[in-house]
Design a protein with these regions (language model features):
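Beta-sandwich/jelly-roll carbohydrate-recognition scaffolds of carbohydrate-active enzymes
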Residues: 1-192
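A generic secondary-structure signal for well-formed alpha-helical elements
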Residues: 2-6, 16, 20, 59, ...
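Short, solvent-exposed loop/turn and secondary-structure capping segments
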Residues: 109-111, 167-174, 206-209, 217-220, ...
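Short alpha-helical scaffolding segments that buttress acidic/His motifs in well-ordered protein cores
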Residues: 154-161, 223, 275, 337
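Glycine- and aromatic-rich loop/turn segments at beta-sheet edges
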Residues: 170-188, 228-239, 283-301, 345-359
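Aromatic-rich carbohydrate-recognition surfaces in CAZymes
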Residues: 193-321, 334
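Catalytic cores of carbohydrate-active enzymes
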Residues: 234, 318, 322-360
């Protein structure tokens, strides 16, 4: 509200979580632009994010800071904890706007994303466009009845359900693969990450088969792309890596659900191959599950939970195989799916851990 100096800090040293900064750089690439990259490791390793930030007018004074110390006579900083302070002389009521493009591939792609999405628009125009898109998405389901509070709860939950997964391909289709190479999507297709599969395979993914079949096909293709690189379907992928979080191999249920509901746009035979190979991986007690039909509770924590989710996923594989006419695979996984009976205790009508235990 008054004439004076206004500054914007681009702070690559700051993090909301306990991430390790592996590498970073900041560079002035135009009188009104700062670009750079930060590569971090935390839940997964190697999460490079490139950016290109353009101000609404040329920068008047640019101060570089590395490891807390001011650096002079440079247009680029390389290191880990980096900051840039862009300063402007402003009149009372004047606003400095900053348009930022991001990419997991390159600064060039970040700049292209920014120009594609934001060129010719100010903050208010972008805000109105975002509001319109959210209104369109939330209008995809219309409900009747219930109290005002219940309807607010419903649409709030629908909003939350649309925050992730994240589309990670750029406007030109390029994206960072799990081997850190660069892939490219086909025209009209998208590549997604942040697939919290253990949390979402039961309800969210089935809901999406009703709301957006093209999106579901993109999710399946994303999972198969990860399989092509790693030899295994994703469990809980983030950015360009795998967290390995939670139990089961629930990509198979997402793929089977899509196929059984008539959603195509991916190779069913390749999908079945990926499902079978992922189910044969020796992770989280799967070796006992495959060999013995149960997971000893004294050898593996979460043994019952792991078994039940393996069994459900195996049932999904059997259904997919049957739909594709692969009867041998269907029979094998249908038998594996019955492993749940090995931990069902009829005396209490509940599932219980099984193993060799010493009496106290």
């Amino acid at each position: 509200d008054r004439t004076g100096e206004a500054s914007v800090v681009i702070d690559l040293a700051h993090s909301l979580t306990s991430e390790t900064i592996q590498a970073a750089y900041l560079e002035q690439t135009a009188p009104d632009e700062i670009s750079g990259m930060r590569n971090t490791s935390a839940w997964v390793n190697n999460q490079p994010i490139y950016f290109a930030a353009r101000f609404s007018r040329p920068i008047e004074t640019l101060t570089w800071v590395k490891e807390g110390k001011v650096c002079r006579d440079t247009v680029r900083l390389d290191g880990e904890k980096l900051q840039a302070v862009a300063t402007f002389h402003v009149k009372a009521g004047e606003t400095i706007e900053l348009q930022v493009g991001v990419s997991a591939v390159s600064v060039g792609n970040a700049r292209f994303n920014r120009e594609h999405d934001l060129i010719g628009q100010d903050f208010d125009a972008v805000r109105k466009k975002a509001d319109k898109e959210w209104q369109s998405l939330l209008s995809g389901i219309r409900i009747k009845g219930g109290s005002p509070e219940e309807r607010v709860n419903f649409y709030t939950a629908l909003y939350h359900s649309s925050v992730v997964p994240n589309r990670i391909n750029d406007v030109n289709g390029e994206y960072r693969r799990h081997d850190m190479g660069i892939g490219r999507t086909g025209k009209g297709k998208n590549r997604y990450s942040t697939l919290s599969l253990w949390d979402t395979f039961r309800a969210w993914h089935p809901m999406m088969t009703l709301l957006d079949t093209a999106f579901v096909a993109d999710i399946v293709r994303s999972a198969l792309d990860i399989y092509e690189i790693t030899g295994e379907l994703p469990v809980w992928p983030l950015a360009s890596g795998e967290t390995g979080t939670m139990i089961g191999y629930h990509s198979v249920s997402v793929i089977a659900d899509a196929w059984m509901k008539g959603i195509r746009g991916f190779d069913g035979g390749k999908a079945l191959e990926a499902m079978v190979r992922s189910a044969e991986k020796n992770t989280k007690g799967a070796d006992y599950y495959i060999r013995e039909g149960y997971i000893p509770a004294n050898f593996r924590k979460e043994s019952v939970s792991c078994l039940l989710e393996f069994a459900y996923d195996d049932w999904c594989i059997s259904r997919m195989a049957e739909a594709l006419g692969e009867q041998d695979i269907a029979g094998r996984f249908a038998r594996r799916a019955r492993n749940y009976i090995h931990v069902f205790d009829g005396s209490c009508r509940f599932f219980r851990g099984k193993g060799d235990f010493m009496r106290r």
